[in-house]
Amino acid sequence: MAESSKTPYLLIAVLVLAVLGVYLPGLRNELLFDDMRLSDGTIFGQYGSLMDLRPRTLSYGSFVWLQKLLGDGWWKQRLFNVGLHLGVCAAVYALLKALLAHTRFPQDIEEQAHFTRSRDAALCIGVGLFALNPAAVYAVGYLVQRSIVMATLFAVLACWAFVRGLQTGRAAWHAGALACYALAVLSKEHAVMTAAMALPLYIYLRRPGWKTIAMVATAALLLVAVAAAVLHGIYGDVLGRVFDPRSAALAQQLEALRPGVAARMYPLSILNEAALFFAYGLLWVFPYVGWMSVDLRPPFPLGFASPWHLAGALGYLALLAGAAWMLLRRTGVLGLAALCLLFPLLWYWTEFATVWVQDPFVLYRSYLWAVALPGLLAIVLTGFHPRTLYIVGAVAGLVLGGMALERVASLRDDGTVWSDAAEKINRDAPPNAVGRSRPFLNLGAYHLERGALDQATREFIIADALGDLGGNARFNAGVALQQQKQHEAALQSFAAAQTKGFSGPLLHYHRAESEFALGRYEAAFNGFDTALREPGEDSESIRRMQLTLRQRHADAALATGRLDTAVSDFRALLKISPQNARVQVGLGIALASQGKTTEALAIFNPLIARSPSAPAFYGRAVAYHHAGRAPEALKDLDQAIRLEPGNAQYRAVREQFAASAGKP
């Protein structure tokens, strides 16, 4: 039975609808983790000009250009990611179709009446399952990871254009391949090895002699070298070393487990990543979502004799050598299978460029390496009846699509993404599985921000137990305990955080707040004073914190009798916020305590006329008391109590003033 001419269009429509069904429910997902580059000015403040070449100029710049074209709305940016994903699927289909057309299958398969339709159906199923694979969600649904999706699109197009150039003999195709390669590298540096694929593609399509192979290899390596040299100018301080403070801290944790590891981090990272090649492949071939999250933490090898890592690394080398040998010695489906294996094996080399200890196993990077899987699947399935293939493909697509939809839902917000990641962390893993604290730390921060203090404290304690770096977990646990008014426990947590290396104005501020709440005003004043004097980052949030610190410093100065300091602080605050009632009350009380009651009343009277609040009446009562006007003081205190009947301080002060005045 001949295939209908409408079948390809029907398959395209089904695939597009299936992909949209997976990703459209996530269009309103919030920005997550690395997505913060989109909101903190990193991307929109530095990208958007093709004349100013930066890392990922094209992919990051596309956010700026798309916003200028379509306006604000993260859903528009997400929809563009989905469009890129569909573009990748189309490019993969075009590349593999061109390669399959060149491939001779066993004679008994080629003699089948449905051979061509079976081959096309097998490829369609392979591309469709790639499109719906839940592992792809971490590239497509994670907004800022557009870089790897765009790099994959141009890398595959470069390979396809090169193949078409070899098949047609037209130089324009080769020029297009070179342009697409440049665009791929400008999208993300992980595509740099795409040029190396020219050699296996040429060997597969032309079966050249050794002299020609050497010439093509030289040209391909020269192109890779040029691109690598450009990237070295950008990433030179990253290559072969631990490149950020968090990674350095994790390396020190490993050093504590086995002295000498820190000096061997680079070769151990190569060993680790070579073994993880198979873990990535496993998650794409058997995409069980229970093994997936944004923060996976496999053990880092402490030596070169680690059995699992050694077996994985030897397996990677054996697979690379075997695929190269098979490509050179075999034609037909075995040669194509070898070629498909060489795609991820060669692209994966960028994993060996630096020390991956902070993010050793992240699924979005694997999107590029997975594009050859549809080719391998097409080889296996070709020969089966097309009807059977479409039925099996539909069932598999429904299963994968459902799992992918669940992964999209897991990326809805910080709460879902870090809850999911925390669930996937093995708390009983060996201690060299460093970095496991991060999901719990971030989940605790999410709960703390929303006032779920018990949950936040619990997550912070788990993070601390799993080796959190620098005392962050202990500090945040202290903040959660402080908000629950468990101030002694909070102070113990702050002390533990400081012991683990946490420092800065925030630590002194929060410790002083708990001291103040416990009535230890001298310690509180010293804490606020230290926080004010300690330099911090120059940001809007830090500047706002400085205002809060100055106000609390003034409060503590007033409580400890440092009246000149209190007055100075309150006056400085009033220059910034002249109508701040709380600051006016503080200044009035400080002036009254200095005996400047006339000046104090000149603050309180218009304040009460404008905004008759309980603190204002209380402050004026203090001024009246210092002025010896007991009846007015008691009257204002009564008014303050009526406005805030639950305030124990007002009642205690009234009893004190009444006793000193000899009145009930």
Kindly give the residue locations of the regions a language model identified.
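Polytopic membrane enzymes that build or remodel cell-surface glycoconjugates and lipids
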Residues: 2-483, 503-506, 510, 517
